[in-house]
């Protein structure tokens, strides 16, 4: 049993006003359903808020995704949930973070340290690698990162290839977020 507003956030669907980061993260790991509303008068003394009973069932097997990256992507997307993803990923703070992570990724890839760490960090790795290889993207090299607008165009190209640049976070379903993360990872853009 939860406070009604919190319970409604857990069970919200895309395009509803209460759809938020909490909803997306909860649905990644479980199925959530609203069972019943509990009125104020069922308690003594009556509280000032309504309550609801919610069923949360864990998914078996759980989705294979790097939770640190997942949280980073969802956090960025819901920083302003009604802005388009294109506008969110054009912000300087967002681009600074992604460019720093991209440089680190390229350096790890060049040193060969990435192969051993990615399979252990992903919790199995092979499923993630299959998803990433299904979205081939021409990657930028370290020399290409000298021009800031080039990296910005690269990020926006990843969004446009998946038709995400004009979409809003509050309208994306769970599968859309998983596809977006897979597209960014295939392009070498990470959210750690």
Describe these PLM feature segments:
Residues 1-192:
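Class I S-adenosyl-L-methionine
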